[in-house]
Amino acid sequence: MPRTRPAPIVLSVGGSLLRSGDPARDGAYFAALATLLGRVGRQRPLVVTTGGGQTAREYIGLGRRLGLTEVELDELGIEVTRLHARLLAARLGPPTPAHPPASVREVVAALAHASPVILGGTEPGHTTDGVAALVAARLRAEAVVNATDVDGIYSADPRHRPAARRFDRLDWEQLRAMVVRDTSGGAGQHFPFDRLGVETLDRAGIPLRVVDGRDLVNLGRALRGERFAGTNVTGRAR
Ligand code: UTP
């Protein structure tokens, strides 16, 4: 009888987790994250997207001063996300591809031989959250895990509004309303989870788990489908 392969899982790591401004802290984080991803990736097919964070915003800001177009600014952002993917992939070593796949199609091909597969951005106009969602839809993934620098989705930004409350569970309509409220679509903006990601996962009926990626024990739980602290976004597929 054929052995059933566990369903793939897709992780989107926010750039703010990868570049804090403190090289010693970032080195330790990359190393510990790579260890966790290697372990989970051996148990099931795992795809990871890496964000560009503050570094991407710095390059996009510089490009904007130089009068670059929005598409050119997005392309700068993509280069930074790919740099972060390369760092993580190189730490993991073969068979994880050292050169991050540049499209969803390339991810599918790479995953036939390696897990985890790490990539950055692909096309101008969205973020690595959107890439993670597109990959998940193509792979019929069990879930997307979004690792960020807050421990879930709040009613308002908890860094500025101490009274904001964390949602344990949201449906897609609620998350869509929050994303639309907080974004206008320019290059380098900071989204809770990007619009393309919300639309793609809602259509595909794939749940989203939002967790604090600084807590690698909790991140491991979210990746393995165990109980985790954070926000679960679910809803009926349309
Ligand atoms: P990020 O995915 O890092 O976006 O891509 P972000 O919203 O800044 O997320 P955090 O802060 O890392 O969590 C950085 C920028 O690169 C461009 C966009 O301009 C994005 O804002 N980008 C990225 C693309 O145009 N396409 C992609 O597929 C990925």
Q: What are these language model-derived features?
A:
Residues M1-R238:
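C-terminal catalytic "cap/lid" subdomain
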